[in-house]
Design a protein with these regions (language model features):
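Glycine/threonine-rich flexible loop motifs
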Residues: 45-50, 177-181
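Active-site phosphate/pyrophosphate- and oxyanion-stabilizing loops and adjacent acidic/basic residues
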Residues: 56, 100, 130, 156, ...
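Structural beta-alpha unit
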Residues: 2-36, 137-187, 191-195, 202-208
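Redox- and metal-dependent alpha/beta enzyme cores, enriched for Fe-S-associated oxidoreductases
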Residues: 93-137
Length: 208
């Protein structure tokens, strides 16, 4: 299909006979890409699979934020964004700025969901929380807490009960996303995404 013209964007078609993951990593590195946008379904289009295998590989391993768009998703402005976190890892300024710039034109509110049995934060967690607040200063930030023992269920419940338009998570060790990405069926995940999903990367990268 022909891409509609947009004065704010230019489009270039890139062809590669390489493996998708390798090709994506190469162009991200060469062009210092800010974000990858892709669909969530592969050739099988299996309704029991949340992400296609290609999407999973890119989400987990490419050193760049990835915005995954569900199959048959109808565009709507992202007015309400969910960002589950444990506040245990330092966040990248560049990637939080990306989220801020994506959300601010729509005056979106961002719900930071802390999933824990205790609302008390360590000094490290408090520092990371303050950093997020500073970097997302253009947006309305709501700090929420839930004590649900099942992370996937906690996220799924919050998505459905609060009319969330976009889910944001960080791909790193010791984060919620790491465990969720390795569970692909609805029965295992209890999380079926029908909204855009932005995966930020806590991976070393040059030119940050």
């Amino acid at each position: 299909n022909k891409i509609s013209p947009n004065p704010k964007h230019t489009y270039k078609i890139v062809s590669s006979n390489n493996i998708l993951l390798d090709a994506a990593d190469k162009i991200v590195d060469e062009k210092n890409m800010d974000i990858i946008v892709m669909g969530t379904r592969g050739i099988t289009n299996d309704k029991k699979i949340t992400f296609g295998s290609h999407t999973l590989q890119v989400l987990k391993y490419v050193q760049c934020p990835v915005l995954a768009i569900p199959n048959h998703y109808k565009y709507k402005q992202p007015k309400h964004i969910l960002f589950p976190t444990n506040y245990l890892i330092p966040y990248k300024r560049r990637e939080l700025k990306l989220l801020c710039e994506m959300a601010s034109p729509f005056r979106a509110s961002i719900d930071m969901l802390y999933i824990s049995r205790s609302e008390t934060l360590s000094m490290r967690q408090q520092d990371n929380r303050n950093f997020i607040k500073d970097e997302l200063h253009k947006n309305i930030i709501n700090f929420k807490t839930t004590n649900d023992k099942n992370i996937s269920n906690a996220i799924y419940t919050y998505l459905k009960e609060n009319s969330i338009d976009m889910l944001v998570m960080v791909n790193s060790r010791l984060t919620f996303l790491e465990s969720i990405l390795f569970k692909t069926t609805i029965d295992k995940m209890s999380l079926y995404l029908d909204i855009p999903f932005l995966a930020l990367q806590n991976i070393s990268r040059e030119n940050l």
